[in-house]
From Swiss-Prot:
InterPro entries: P-loop_NTPase, SMG9. It comes from Caenorhabditis elegans. The keyword Aminoacyl-tRNA synthetase does not apply. Belongs to the SMG9 family. Disruption phenotype: Defects in nonsense-mediated decay (NMD). The keyword RNA-binding does not apply. Keywords: Nonsense-mediated mRNA decay. This is Nonsense-mediated mRNA decay factor SMG9. SUPFAM superfamilies: P-loop containing nucleoside triphosphate hydrolases (SSF52540).
Length: 385
């Protein structure tokens, strides 16, 4: 048993022309959770049951998890411990949906902080309007044995521009789809929970992509500890920039039922059957103004921010549940072994072979490409049958 103390740190007050507090720490002003091991009596000798949580290096901001060559960065191993009590949370979605912002909040930031203080730097409004993206491949941030993975946007025009093109200067749609499937399939395999972040409650293009990506799996039969082949990844859908109608309980229930129907026959993906656990509706966070730190928030603004932070805290607690073990044996996988598994997935020949066959099928015209995205479900059953 461990004693958990929640320590809340208040922001220092500014007086006169005092400068703002330093923003070196991204979690400044956010709740901090310190897990302390129960003290052992002096006359009791240490036993195998006395567990000391491994220490973890503090990160100030997210770093690249995957390099431009698709390999895992070597420095990541120094950030992980041998603790088996860890949680991997990923976020996918289109450009500008709020993936980086949401992960930053879950990692410890709060709604009153400036964007430059977020551990995952979000795309600026100007860059988003110009269809430019911020995250490249996958970024990672680790805190309190929580591993957060932020994926580059799906179907981003700026990403497609950097991909190989066919003759005539036209976009190679099959390559773009293959790149999206590669990252999505990887995150589905190595994550406990994947957050599907979108401005719409039901993005069919994303759902179709998920149904195809779940079938693109590596073959890691000789990996040790032995992996659980029937493990399911938990999906949580996040509706961002919600309007008043989106917040109605009856509307949320109806939309959750639609999402459950979309994954009722899934073998490796699951959604919660409890109400208000499948679809989380969040209102937009406006850009924080500098004077809010010094003059205080307006009453309505403060109430809205407090409500948002409480909702994030509830989601953070909920994400600790419904975690299925990666391995057959309970708690056999620790953080460092998880990283070894990630490397094996990246290098797995079966996964790459499936992706190449899928890309070849798309190039030959088996797949259908729509102007507003990619339709992935109808022909997937033909391809994988």
């Amino acid at each position: 048993m461990k004693k958990v103390e929640i320590l809340k740190t208040s922001r220092p007050s500014s007086a006169g022309g005092a400068a703002r507090p330093s923003t070196a720490s991204p979690t400044h002003g956010a709740p901090k959770i310190a897990i302390k091991t129960r003290p052992v009596a002096d006359d009791v000798a240490p036993t195998a049951a006395t567990v000391i949580e491994p220490s973890q290096k503090a990160m100030k901001e997210s770093v690249r998890f995957l390099t431009d060559f698709g390999e895992i960065s070597d420095a990541i191993s120094d950030l992980l411990t041998s603790s088996p009590n860890f949680n991997v949370i990923s976020a996918i979605g289109p450009q500008g949906a709020g993936k980086s912002t949401l992960l930053s909040m879950l990692a410890g930031n709060n709604s009153r902080q400036m964007y430059r203080e977020y551990v995952f730097r979000p795309v600026s409004r100007e860059a988003n309007e110009q269809s430019r993206h911020q995250t490249i491949q996958i970024d990672i941030y680790i805190v309190n044995h929580q591993i957060f993975l932020d994926c580059q946007p799906m179907y981003s025009f700026s990403i497609m521009e950097g991909l190989p093109k066919v003759r005539g200067g036209r976009f190679d749609d099959s390559t773009a789809m293959s790149d999206t499937l590669r990252l999505t399939a990887f995150l589905l395999y190595v994550s406990h929970t994947v957050l599907v972040v979108s401005e719409t409650h039901y993005d069919k293009v994303i759902i179709d992509t998920l149904r195809v990506a779940e079938q693109i799996r590596p073959y890691l039969a000789i990996f040790r500890p032995k992996l659980a082949i029937d493990r399911k990844t938990n999906l949580v859908f996040i509706k961002t920039k919600a309007s008043s109608i989106d917040l109605a309980p009856t509307v949320i229930r109806e939309r959750e039922e639609l999402l459950r129907l979309s994954f009722q026959d899934s073998r490796w993906l699951k959604v919660s059957q409890e109400p208000f656990k499948t679809l989380i509706v969040l209102e937009e966070i406006r850009v924080r103004r500098e004077h809010l730190f010094e003059e205080g928030d307006e009453p309505d603004e403060a109430a809205s921010l407090n409500e948002f932070d409480e909702q994030i805290a509830e989601l953070r607690e909920e994400l600790q549940k419904n975690r299925e073990d990666f391995t057959v044996e309970t708690a056999a996988m620790d953080e460092k072994k998880w990283l070894d598994m990630c490397r094996e997935v990246i290098r797995d020949k079966t996964l790459h072979k499936t992706l190449k066959e899928y890309q070849r099928a798309m190039t030959d015209g088996v797949r259908t490409h729509f102007d507003n995205g990619f339709h992935a479900e109808r022909d997937a059953n033909k391809f994988f049958s």
